[in-house]
Amino acid sequence: MSDARRLVDKLWSYCNVLRDDGVGTIEYTEQLTYLLFLKMAHERAQRELNPQQIVPSEYSWQTLLDAKGDALETQYRHILEELGKRPGVLGTIFRKAQNRIQDPAKLKRLIVDLIDKENWSATGTDIKGDAYEALLSRGAEDIKSGAGQYFTPRAVIQAIVDCVRPTVKDTVVDPAAGTAGFLLAAHEYASRGSESMTRTEKNHLQHDFAYGYELVDGTARLAAMNMLLHGIGNPAGDSLIEVRDALISDPGQRWSVVLSNPPFGRKSSLAMVGADGFEVREDRAIERQDFVVTTSNKQFNFLQHIATILDINGRAAVVLPDNVLFEGGAGETLRRKLLRDFDLHTMLRLPTGIFYAQGVKANVLFFDKKPAAERPWTDRLWIYDLRTNQHFTLKQNPLRRQHLDDFVECYAPEKARSERTESERFRSFTYAELIARDKVNFDVTWLRDESLEDTDNLPAPHLIAREIIEDLTAALVELEAVAAALEPASGGTPA
Protein backbone atom coordinates (compact mmCIF):
# COMPACT_ATOMS: atom_id res chain seq x y z
CA MET A 1 0.00 0.00 0.00
CA SER A 2 1.35 3.45 -0.94
CA ASP A 3 2.03 6.06 1.74
CA ALA A 4 -0.64 8.31 0.22
CA ARG A 5 -3.22 5.51 0.30
CA ARG A 6 -2.31 4.66 3.90
CA LEU A 7 -2.80 8.28 4.88
CA VAL A 8 -6.11 8.51 3.01
CA ASP A 9 -7.43 5.40 4.75
CA LYS A 10 -6.37 6.78 8.11
CA LEU A 11 -8.01 10.15 7.47
CA TRP A 12 -11.13 8.49 6.08
CA SER A 13 -11.53 6.27 9.15
CA TYR A 14 -11.98 9.36 11.31
CA CYS A 15 -14.51 10.74 8.87
CA ASN A 16 -16.62 7.64 9.43
CA VAL A 17 -16.42 8.18 13.20
CA LEU A 18 -17.81 11.70 12.82
CA ARG A 19 -20.45 10.77 10.25
CA ASP A 20 -22.74 9.54 13.04
CA ASP A 21 -22.71 13.08 14.42
CA GLY A 22 -23.94 14.47 11.12
CA VAL A 23 -20.55 15.70 9.90
CA GLY A 24 -20.35 15.26 6.11
CA THR A 25 -17.21 14.55 4.11
CA ILE A 26 -16.62 18.15 3.02
CA GLU A 27 -17.30 19.48 6.53
CA TYR A 28 -14.82 16.93 7.88
CA THR A 29 -12.27 17.98 5.27
CA GLU A 30 -12.75 21.60 6.36
CA GLN A 31 -12.02 20.66 9.99
CA LEU A 32 -8.96 18.75 8.83
CA THR A 33 -7.87 21.85 6.92
CA TYR A 34 -7.94 24.01 10.05
CA LEU A 35 -6.15 21.46 12.22
CA LEU A 36 -3.58 20.52 9.58
CA PHE A 37 -2.68 24.16 9.04
CA LEU A 38 -2.27 24.74 12.79
CA LYS A 39 -0.12 21.62 13.17
CA MET A 40 2.09 22.48 10.18
CA ALA A 41 2.47 26.05 11.47
CA HIS A 42 3.49 24.58 14.84
CA GLU A 43 6.10 22.37 13.15
CA ARG A 44 7.47 25.38 11.29
CA ALA A 45 7.76 27.34 14.55
CA GLN A 46 9.57 24.43 16.26
CA ARG A 47 12.13 23.63 13.58
CA GLU A 48 15.79 24.24 14.38
CA LEU A 49 16.74 25.90 11.10
CA ASN A 50 15.01 29.22 10.40
CA PRO A 51 11.96 28.81 12.69
CA GLN A 52 8.94 30.90 11.70
CA GLN A 53 5.98 31.90 13.87
CA ILE A 54 3.01 32.00 11.47
CA VAL A 55 0.26 31.70 14.09
CA PRO A 56 0.40 33.84 17.28
CA SER A 57 1.24 31.73 20.34
CA GLU A 58 -2.16 32.30 21.96
CA TYR A 59 -3.81 30.57 18.98
CA SER A 60 -1.19 27.86 18.47
CA TRP A 61 -1.46 24.10 18.13
CA GLN A 62 -0.01 23.70 21.61
CA THR A 63 -3.03 25.46 23.15
CA LEU A 64 -5.25 22.76 21.65
CA LEU A 65 -3.03 19.99 22.98
CA ASP A 66 -3.16 21.51 26.46
CA ALA A 67 -6.94 22.02 26.59
CA LYS A 68 -9.53 19.40 27.57
CA GLY A 69 -13.31 19.03 27.57
CA ASP A 70 -15.40 22.15 27.09
CA ALA A 71 -12.28 24.30 27.35
CA LEU A 72 -10.93 22.59 24.21
CA GLU A 73 -14.06 23.36 22.23
CA THR A 74 -14.03 26.96 23.46
CA GLN A 75 -10.37 27.44 22.53
CA TYR A 76 -10.88 25.84 19.12
CA ARG A 77 -13.80 28.16 18.34
CA HIS A 78 -11.76 31.14 19.55
CA ILE A 79 -8.84 30.21 17.29
CA LEU A 80 -11.07 29.84 14.23
CA GLU A 81 -12.76 33.18 14.86
CA GLU A 82 -9.57 35.16 15.49
CA LEU A 83 -7.48 33.71 12.66
CA GLY A 84 -10.34 34.40 10.24
CA LYS A 85 -9.73 38.12 10.81
CA ARG A 86 -6.11 37.90 9.66
CA PRO A 87 -4.86 38.85 6.17
CA GLY A 88 -3.17 36.56 3.65
CA VAL A 89 -3.35 32.78 3.69
CA LEU A 90 -4.55 32.75 7.31
CA GLY A 91 -7.59 34.83 6.41
CA THR A 92 -8.43 32.72 3.36
CA ILE A 93 -8.27 29.41 5.23
CA PHE A 94 -10.02 30.54 8.43
CA ARG A 95 -12.49 33.06 6.97
CA LYS A 96 -15.96 32.38 8.47
CA ALA A 97 -14.64 29.09 9.88
CA GLN A 98 -16.86 27.18 12.32
CA ASN A 99 -16.37 24.15 14.53
CA ARG A 100 -18.57 21.28 13.30
CA ILE A 101 -17.29 18.73 15.85
CA GLN A 102 -19.55 19.23 18.84
CA ASP A 103 -18.19 16.35 20.94
CA PRO A 104 -14.97 17.54 22.71
CA ALA A 105 -13.83 13.93 23.16
CA LYS A 106 -13.95 13.29 19.41
CA LEU A 107 -12.24 16.60 18.72
CA LYS A 108 -9.47 15.66 21.15
CA ARG A 109 -9.11 12.26 19.51
CA LEU A 110 -8.81 13.90 16.09
CA ILE A 111 -6.15 16.29 17.38
CA VAL A 112 -4.06 13.85 19.42
CA ASP A 113 -4.44 10.51 17.65
CA LEU A 114 -4.60 11.61 14.02
CA ILE A 115 -3.04 15.02 13.40
CA ASP A 116 -0.42 15.28 16.15
CA LYS A 117 1.09 11.85 15.53
CA GLU A 118 2.13 12.75 11.98
CA ASN A 119 5.11 14.93 11.12
CA TRP A 120 3.37 16.73 8.28
CA SER A 121 6.32 18.93 7.35
CA ALA A 122 8.45 15.83 6.79
CA THR A 123 5.77 14.11 4.71
CA GLY A 124 6.34 14.60 0.97
CA THR A 125 4.12 17.12 -0.81
CA ASP A 126 3.04 14.41 -3.24
CA ILE A 127 1.80 12.22 -0.37
CA LYS A 128 0.04 15.03 1.51
CA GLY A 129 -1.38 16.47 -1.69
CA ASP A 130 -2.60 13.15 -3.06
CA ALA A 131 -4.24 12.28 0.25
CA TYR A 132 -6.02 15.64 0.42
CA GLU A 133 -7.12 15.39 -3.22
CA ALA A 134 -8.55 11.93 -2.50
CA LEU A 135 -10.62 13.35 0.37
CA LEU A 136 -11.90 16.15 -1.86
CA SER A 137 -12.83 13.58 -4.50
CA ARG A 138 -14.79 11.55 -1.97
CA GLY A 139 -16.42 14.75 -0.78
CA ALA A 140 -17.57 15.47 -4.33
CA GLU A 141 -19.39 12.13 -4.27
CA ASP A 142 -21.36 13.29 -1.23
CA ILE A 143 -24.46 14.42 -3.11
CA LYS A 144 -26.04 16.13 -0.10
CA SER A 145 -23.09 18.49 0.27
CA GLY A 146 -23.41 19.80 -3.27
CA ALA A 147 -19.62 19.85 -3.46
CA GLY A 148 -19.60 18.03 -6.80
CA GLN A 149 -20.43 21.27 -8.62
CA TYR A 150 -16.92 22.46 -7.82
CA PHE A 151 -15.22 19.27 -9.01
CA THR A 152 -14.03 18.89 -12.60
CA PRO A 153 -13.22 15.29 -13.62
CA ARG A 154 -9.47 14.83 -13.18
CA ALA A 155 -9.20 12.99 -16.51
CA VAL A 156 -10.56 16.08 -18.29
CA ILE A 157 -8.21 18.40 -16.41
CA GLN A 158 -5.17 16.25 -17.19
CA ALA A 159 -6.02 16.03 -20.89
CA ILE A 160 -6.59 19.79 -21.14
CA VAL A 161 -3.28 20.55 -19.43
CA ASP A 162 -1.49 18.03 -21.67
CA CYS A 163 -2.81 20.00 -24.66
CA VAL A 164 -2.13 23.53 -23.37
CA ARG A 165 1.32 22.55 -22.01
CA PRO A 166 2.03 25.34 -19.50
CA THR A 167 5.70 26.09 -18.86
CA VAL A 168 7.71 27.74 -16.10
CA LYS A 169 7.59 30.95 -18.15
CA ASP A 170 3.78 31.10 -17.89
CA THR A 171 1.39 32.61 -15.39
CA VAL A 172 -1.82 30.62 -14.96
CA VAL A 173 -5.16 31.76 -13.57
CA ASP A 174 -8.52 30.12 -12.91
CA PRO A 175 -11.28 32.71 -12.31
CA ALA A 176 -13.55 29.97 -10.92
CA ALA A 177 -10.93 27.92 -9.09
CA GLY A 178 -13.10 25.46 -7.17
CA THR A 179 -10.68 23.27 -5.23
CA ALA A 180 -7.77 24.34 -7.50
CA GLY A 181 -7.70 21.24 -9.71
CA PHE A 182 -6.65 23.12 -12.85
CA LEU A 183 -3.99 25.14 -11.02
CA LEU A 184 -2.44 22.06 -9.45
CA ALA A 185 -2.36 20.12 -12.72
CA ALA A 186 -0.79 23.07 -14.53
CA HIS A 187 1.82 23.45 -11.77
CA GLU A 188 2.63 19.75 -11.87
CA TYR A 189 3.07 19.85 -15.66
CA ALA A 190 5.24 22.98 -15.59
CA SER A 191 7.37 21.51 -12.78
CA ARG A 192 8.61 18.63 -14.91
CA GLY A 193 12.36 18.85 -15.16
CA SER A 194 12.53 21.17 -12.15
CA GLU A 195 15.92 19.72 -11.18
CA SER A 196 17.47 21.71 -14.03
CA MET A 197 15.61 24.96 -13.27
CA THR A 198 17.26 28.05 -11.86
CA ARG A 199 16.44 29.30 -8.37
CA THR A 200 14.47 32.17 -9.94
CA GLU A 201 12.35 29.74 -11.97
CA LYS A 202 11.65 27.55 -8.94
CA ASN A 203 10.66 30.62 -6.93
CA HIS A 204 8.31 31.70 -9.72
CA LEU A 205 6.68 28.25 -9.77
CA GLN A 206 6.09 28.32 -6.03
CA HIS A 207 4.90 31.89 -5.59
CA ASP A 208 3.87 33.57 -8.87
CA PHE A 209 2.92 30.84 -11.35
CA ALA A 210 -0.66 30.07 -10.27
CA TYR A 211 -3.53 32.25 -9.03
CA GLY A 212 -7.22 31.63 -8.53
CA TYR A 213 -10.49 33.35 -7.69
CA GLU A 214 -13.27 31.60 -5.79
CA LEU A 215 -16.60 33.04 -4.69
CA VAL A 216 -17.49 30.50 -1.96
CA ASP A 217 -15.56 30.76 1.31
CA GLY A 218 -15.58 27.05 2.09
CA THR A 219 -14.36 26.09 -1.37
CA ALA A 220 -11.69 28.81 -1.32
CA ARG A 221 -10.23 27.47 1.92
CA LEU A 222 -10.06 23.96 0.44
CA ALA A 223 -8.33 25.34 -2.65
CA ALA A 224 -5.81 27.34 -0.61
CA MET A 225 -4.97 24.33 1.57
CA ASN A 226 -4.80 22.04 -1.45
CA MET A 227 -2.17 24.30 -2.99
CA LEU A 228 -0.16 24.59 0.23
CA LEU A 229 -0.09 20.82 0.68
CA HIS A 230 1.24 20.54 -2.88
CA GLY A 231 4.04 22.97 -2.04
CA ILE A 232 2.55 26.01 -3.79
CA GLY A 233 2.54 29.36 -2.00
CA ASN A 234 3.71 30.45 1.43
CA PRO A 235 1.61 29.84 4.57
CA ALA A 236 2.97 33.08 6.02
CA GLY A 237 2.38 35.12 2.86
CA ASP A 238 -0.41 36.33 0.62
CA SER A 239 -3.02 33.84 -0.48
CA LEU A 240 -2.89 32.59 -4.06
CA ILE A 241 -6.67 32.08 -3.87
CA GLU A 242 -8.67 35.30 -3.71
CA VAL A 243 -12.17 35.12 -2.24
CA ARG A 244 -14.29 37.29 -4.50
CA ASP A 245 -16.69 37.28 -7.41
CA ALA A 246 -14.32 37.36 -10.37
CA LEU A 247 -17.00 38.86 -12.61
CA ILE A 248 -17.40 42.09 -10.64
CA SER A 249 -14.56 43.94 -12.32
CA ASP A 250 -11.44 43.75 -14.46
CA PRO A 251 -8.59 42.93 -12.03
CA GLY A 252 -6.13 44.77 -14.25
CA GLN A 253 -3.68 41.87 -14.31
CA ARG A 254 -3.18 39.66 -17.37
CA TRP A 255 -2.15 36.00 -17.50
CA SER A 256 -0.59 33.94 -20.27
CA VAL A 257 -2.80 30.90 -19.57
CA VAL A 258 -6.42 30.66 -18.40
CA LEU A 259 -7.81 27.25 -17.45
CA SER A 260 -11.32 27.13 -16.02
CA ASN A 261 -14.60 25.32 -15.56
CA PRO A 262 -17.00 28.13 -14.56
CA PRO A 263 -19.97 27.06 -12.40
CA PHE A 264 -22.93 25.64 -14.29
CA GLY A 265 -26.17 27.57 -14.08
CA ARG A 266 -27.79 29.93 -16.51
CA LYS A 267 -28.09 33.20 -14.59
CA SER A 268 -26.18 35.29 -12.10
CA SER A 269 -28.48 36.50 -9.34
CA LEU A 270 -28.30 38.83 -6.37
CA ALA A 271 -29.99 37.87 -3.08
CA MET A 272 -31.74 40.71 -1.23
CA VAL A 273 -34.25 40.97 1.59
CA GLY A 274 -37.51 42.63 0.64
CA ALA A 275 -39.60 45.00 2.74
CA ASP A 276 -41.63 42.06 4.04
CA GLY A 277 -38.51 40.29 5.30
CA PHE A 278 -38.42 37.55 2.67
CA GLU A 279 -35.48 36.88 0.39
CA VAL A 280 -35.80 38.05 -3.19
CA ARG A 281 -33.40 36.94 -5.93
CA GLU A 282 -33.00 39.31 -8.85
CA ASP A 283 -31.22 38.46 -12.07
CA ARG A 284 -28.00 40.43 -12.16
CA ALA A 285 -26.77 41.64 -15.51
CA ILE A 286 -23.04 42.34 -15.37
CA GLU A 287 -22.18 45.74 -16.84
CA ARG A 288 -18.50 46.29 -17.59
CA GLN A 289 -16.73 48.59 -20.02
CA ASP A 290 -14.61 45.70 -21.29
CA PHE A 291 -17.65 43.47 -22.03
CA VAL A 292 -19.18 43.55 -25.51
CA VAL A 293 -22.60 42.39 -24.26
CA THR A 294 -24.53 43.02 -21.05
CA THR A 295 -26.22 39.85 -19.86
CA SER A 296 -27.13 37.90 -16.73
CA ASN A 297 -25.97 34.65 -18.37
CA LYS A 298 -23.18 33.39 -16.12
CA GLN A 299 -21.30 31.42 -18.78
CA PHE A 300 -21.32 34.30 -21.27
CA ASN A 301 -19.98 36.64 -18.59
CA PHE A 302 -17.20 34.25 -17.61
CA LEU A 303 -16.26 33.90 -21.27
CA GLN A 304 -16.07 37.70 -21.61
CA HIS A 305 -14.07 37.97 -18.40
CA ILE A 306 -11.59 35.35 -19.60
CA ALA A 307 -11.26 37.20 -22.91
CA THR A 308 -10.24 40.29 -20.91
CA ILE A 309 -7.74 38.74 -18.48
CA LEU A 310 -5.95 36.63 -21.11
CA ASP A 311 -2.73 38.26 -22.28
CA ILE A 312 -2.01 38.83 -25.97
CA ASN A 313 -0.88 35.50 -27.49
CA GLY A 314 -2.09 33.79 -24.31
CA ARG A 315 -3.83 30.39 -24.38
CA ALA A 316 -7.17 29.49 -22.82
CA ALA A 317 -9.12 26.28 -22.31
CA VAL A 318 -12.59 26.70 -20.84
CA VAL A 319 -15.30 24.14 -20.02
CA LEU A 320 -18.68 25.52 -21.13
CA PRO A 321 -22.20 24.06 -21.48
CA ASP A 322 -23.91 23.43 -24.81
CA ASN A 323 -26.06 26.57 -24.69
CA VAL A 324 -22.93 28.69 -25.26
CA LEU A 325 -22.62 27.03 -28.68
CA PHE A 326 -26.05 27.89 -30.05
CA GLU A 327 -27.92 30.47 -27.96
CA GLY A 328 -28.84 33.60 -29.90
CA GLY A 329 -28.54 37.27 -28.96
CA ALA A 330 -25.56 37.72 -26.64
CA GLY A 331 -24.37 34.23 -27.52
CA GLU A 332 -24.17 34.97 -31.23
CA THR A 333 -22.33 38.23 -30.57
CA LEU A 334 -19.74 36.46 -28.43
CA ARG A 335 -19.23 33.65 -30.93
CA ARG A 336 -18.57 36.21 -33.66
CA LYS A 337 -16.06 37.96 -31.37
CA LEU A 338 -14.31 34.65 -30.62
CA LEU A 339 -13.89 33.91 -34.31
CA ARG A 340 -12.78 37.45 -35.17
CA ASP A 341 -10.52 38.54 -32.29
CA PHE A 342 -9.23 35.14 -31.13
CA ASP A 343 -7.90 32.03 -32.76
CA LEU A 344 -10.64 29.61 -31.72
CA HIS A 345 -8.84 26.52 -32.94
CA THR A 346 -10.22 23.49 -31.07
CA MET A 347 -13.38 22.26 -29.39
CA LEU A 348 -13.79 19.04 -27.43
CA ARG A 349 -17.37 17.80 -27.11
CA LEU A 350 -17.43 16.07 -23.74
CA PRO A 351 -19.53 12.96 -23.10
CA THR A 352 -22.46 13.01 -20.70
CA GLY A 353 -22.39 11.24 -17.35
CA ILE A 354 -18.98 12.54 -16.24
CA PHE A 355 -20.03 15.45 -13.98
CA TYR A 356 -21.52 15.24 -10.49
CA ALA A 357 -24.06 17.87 -11.53
CA GLN A 358 -26.69 15.80 -13.34
CA GLY A 359 -27.78 16.56 -16.88
CA VAL A 360 -24.71 18.55 -17.86
CA LYS A 361 -23.72 18.61 -21.53
CA ALA A 362 -20.44 20.44 -21.87
CA ASN A 363 -17.56 21.23 -24.19
CA VAL A 364 -14.02 22.53 -23.90
CA LEU A 365 -13.15 25.57 -26.02
CA PHE A 366 -9.45 26.12 -26.75
CA PHE A 367 -8.52 29.58 -28.04
CA ASP A 368 -5.58 32.00 -28.24
CA LYS A 369 -5.85 35.76 -27.80
CA LYS A 370 -4.49 37.82 -30.67
CA PRO A 371 -3.70 41.52 -31.24
CA ALA A 372 -6.14 43.72 -33.14
CA ALA A 373 -6.26 42.99 -36.86
CA GLU A 374 -8.43 43.72 -39.88
CA ARG A 375 -8.99 40.07 -40.74
CA PRO A 376 -10.50 37.38 -38.48
CA TRP A 377 -7.90 35.40 -36.55
CA THR A 378 -9.73 32.05 -36.66
CA ASP A 379 -8.83 30.12 -39.79
CA ARG A 380 -10.57 26.85 -38.92
CA LEU A 381 -12.12 25.24 -35.86
CA TRP A 382 -11.24 21.62 -35.17
CA ILE A 383 -13.98 19.72 -33.34
CA TYR A 384 -13.47 16.39 -31.58
CA ASP A 385 -16.70 14.52 -30.80
CA LEU A 386 -16.24 12.42 -27.66
CA ARG A 387 -19.99 12.39 -26.98
CA THR A 388 -21.72 10.47 -29.76
CA ASN A 389 -21.90 6.71 -29.06
CA GLN A 390 -19.98 7.16 -25.79
CA HIS A 391 -21.56 6.09 -22.51
CA PHE A 392 -19.98 6.98 -19.17
CA THR A 393 -21.25 7.01 -15.60
CA LEU A 394 -19.63 8.26 -12.42
CA LYS A 395 -19.22 4.84 -10.81
CA GLN A 396 -19.93 1.89 -13.14
CA ASN A 397 -18.04 3.27 -16.14
CA PRO A 398 -16.12 6.43 -15.16
CA LEU A 399 -14.19 8.53 -17.65
CA ARG A 400 -10.45 7.86 -17.38
CA ARG A 401 -7.45 9.64 -18.85
CA GLN A 402 -6.90 6.89 -21.45
CA HIS A 403 -10.36 7.62 -22.89
CA LEU A 404 -8.96 11.01 -23.92
CA ASP A 405 -5.72 9.67 -25.41
CA ASP A 406 -7.04 9.83 -28.98
CA PHE A 407 -8.19 13.42 -28.53
CA VAL A 408 -4.78 14.53 -27.22
CA GLU A 409 -3.10 12.66 -30.08
CA CYS A 410 -5.38 14.39 -32.61
CA TYR A 411 -4.82 17.76 -30.91
CA ALA A 412 -1.06 17.15 -31.37
CA PRO A 413 0.22 19.94 -29.11
CA GLU A 414 3.79 19.33 -30.25
CA LYS A 415 2.93 20.04 -33.90
CA ALA A 416 1.70 23.00 -35.90
CA ARG A 417 -2.09 22.92 -36.30
CA SER A 418 -1.64 22.94 -40.07
CA GLU A 419 -0.29 19.39 -39.70
CA ARG A 420 -3.45 18.05 -38.10
CA THR A 421 -5.40 15.38 -39.96
CA GLU A 422 -9.09 14.57 -39.84
CA SER A 423 -10.42 11.30 -38.44
CA GLU A 424 -13.80 9.77 -37.69
CA ARG A 425 -14.22 11.87 -34.56
CA PHE A 426 -12.02 14.83 -35.50
CA ARG A 427 -13.20 17.29 -38.16
CA SER A 428 -12.32 20.86 -39.11
CA PHE A 429 -14.64 23.67 -40.18
CA THR A 430 -13.42 26.86 -41.85
CA TYR A 431 -14.22 30.37 -40.70
CA ALA A 432 -16.44 30.83 -43.77
CA GLU A 433 -18.42 27.67 -42.94
CA LEU A 434 -18.92 28.68 -39.29
CA ILE A 435 -19.85 32.32 -39.93
CA ALA A 436 -22.43 31.22 -42.51
CA ARG A 437 -24.28 28.97 -40.04
CA ASP A 438 -27.54 30.25 -38.56
CA LYS A 439 -26.66 32.45 -35.55
CA VAL A 440 -23.04 31.32 -35.99
CA ASN A 441 -24.03 28.04 -34.35
CA PHE A 442 -21.08 25.93 -33.14
CA ASP A 443 -23.34 22.98 -32.24
CA VAL A 444 -21.93 20.80 -35.03
CA THR A 445 -22.36 17.02 -35.24
CA TRP A 446 -21.63 14.56 -38.02
CA LEU A 447 -21.46 11.11 -36.39
CA ARG A 448 -24.57 8.96 -36.51
CA ASP A 449 -25.93 7.88 -33.14
CA GLU A 450 -25.76 4.11 -33.56
CA SER A 451 -28.04 3.45 -30.62
CA LEU A 452 -30.88 5.08 -32.57
CA GLU A 453 -30.34 2.94 -35.66
CA ASP A 454 -29.13 -0.43 -34.44
CA THR A 455 -31.22 -2.06 -31.73
CA ASP A 456 -28.50 -4.67 -31.25
CA ASN A 457 -26.07 -1.93 -30.30
CA LEU A 458 -28.13 -0.31 -27.56
CA PRO A 459 -26.37 0.61 -24.31
CA ALA A 460 -27.15 -1.37 -21.17
CA PRO A 461 -30.59 -0.57 -19.67
CA HIS A 462 -29.10 1.16 -16.63
CA LEU A 463 -27.08 3.45 -18.93
CA ILE A 464 -30.19 4.31 -20.94
CA ALA A 465 -32.04 5.07 -17.71
CA ARG A 466 -29.18 7.27 -16.53
CA GLU A 467 -29.14 9.22 -19.84
CA ILE A 468 -32.91 9.74 -19.61
CA ILE A 469 -32.49 11.09 -16.07
CA GLU A 470 -29.74 13.44 -17.24
CA ASP A 471 -31.85 14.74 -20.15
CA LEU A 472 -34.86 15.29 -17.87
CA THR A 473 -32.68 17.01 -15.28
CA ALA A 474 -31.24 19.31 -17.95
CA ALA A 475 -34.76 20.13 -19.12
CA LEU A 476 -35.80 20.84 -15.52
CA VAL A 477 -32.90 23.26 -15.10
CA GLU A 478 -34.05 25.13 -18.23
CA LEU A 479 -37.66 25.24 -16.97
CA GLU A 480 -36.56 26.51 -13.56
CA ALA A 481 -34.64 29.31 -15.27
CA VAL A 482 -37.75 30.25 -17.27
CA ALA A 483 -39.92 30.13 -14.15
CA ALA A 484 -37.46 32.29 -12.23
CA ALA A 485 -37.42 34.83 -15.06
CA LEU A 486 -41.24 35.01 -15.02
CA GLU A 487 -41.54 35.53 -11.26
CA PRO A 488 -42.47 39.08 -10.21
CA ALA A 489 -39.75 40.99 -8.37
CA SER A 490 -41.51 40.95 -5.02
CA GLY A 491 -41.25 39.21 -1.68
CA GLY A 492 -42.14 35.60 -1.20
CA THR A 493 -45.11 34.12 0.57
CA PRO A 494 -44.70 32.45 3.98
CA ALA A 495 -44.96 28.67 3.85
Where is each model-derived feature located?
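Conserved S-adenosyl-L-methionine
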Residues: 146-260, 264-276, 285, 289, ...
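Hydrophobic alpha-helix feature that most strongly marks membrane-spanning transmembrane helices
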Residues: 191, 228, 232, 263, ...
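Short hydrophobic/aromatic beta-strand or adjacent loop that forms the aromatic wall/cage
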Residues: 360-364, 381, 404
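Non-catalytic, mostly N-terminal accessory regions of nucleic-acid modification and defense proteins
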Residues: 1-168, 231, 235-248, 349-353, ...
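Conserved Class I SAM-dependent methyltransferase catalytic core
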Residues: 28, 160, 215-222, 292-367
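Short, contiguous acidic/charged loop-to-helix segments that flank catalytic cores in large enzymes
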Residues: 269-297, 322-330, 351-357, 372, ...
